[in-house]
Amino acid sequence: MYIPAHFAADDATVHELLTRHGAADLITLTADGLLATMLPFAYEPDAGEHGARWGALYGHVARNNDQWRKPALGESLAIVRGPDAYVSPSWYAAKAEHGRVVPTWNYVTAHVYGQLVVHDDPAWVEDVVRRLTAKHEAARLQSPGQSPQWSVDNAPRNFIEGQLRAIVGLELRITRIEAKAKLSQNRPVTDIPGVVAGLSARGDDRSAQAVEHANERREAQDRPGGRRGRNPARSAN
């Protein structure tokens, strides 16, 4: 992935994206070509027993899905997407100053590469199902007016066992991550309030907060003694 230095996501951003996000596009190259599946996943940063710095992603697919049956050639790839949004040039202060502005698209994404391991084991799969359920039920309860938390144990055991037989577990042992947070860091600081206000007015608070936080970090880094000096010539891609 092309990542200009000012859009490179730091470790904390990557960890937050993998921890909070719910699903990824899992892509594998097989002898028959490329295969892809939307994969709900749980991130385990401490799964380093195989020497992986970043840990592993755990998930499952339908037993009828051919992707788990066809061996991956080389690394597999999971594409995790964070907030993304259209950015109108009408939001920039620079529009009124000189008019030399164009639209763009802000986004946060991580390309997670690793060794794909298949777990055709009901006990392993049940553990992952319980992790995923606990994660997303807890997140759901953060919103008001929710029904009580659901647990795997709320369903009849024989029903759960039948459901588990219909899925297969997948583990992506992470070998490397390429991550990008393109959040208007290439714009003059005077343009940032307009971007945040524009996104907020459209109801996209998540993108607005991402822009705000990324540019707060940028300002801290650009101050004397920060991690980098100011570089006025920054790519927009």
Language model: regions and residue ranges:
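Short, basic/aromatic recognition patches
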Residues: 1-25
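A generic local secondary-structure boundary/capping motif
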Residues: 15, 100-102, 159-162
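Short connector loops at helix/strand junctions that flank enzyme active sites
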Residues: 21, 36-38, 52-56, 71-75, ...
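Short beta-strand segments
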Residues: 21-63, 78, 89
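Pocket-edge structural micro-motifs
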Residues: 28, 61, 80-82, 174-176, ...
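Short, glycine- and charge-enriched coil/turn segments that flank and shape catalytic ligand pockets
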Residues: 45-52, 71-72, 203-205
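Short, structured beta-strand-loop surface elements
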Residues: 62-128
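C-terminal edge-of-domain segments
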Residues: 117-237
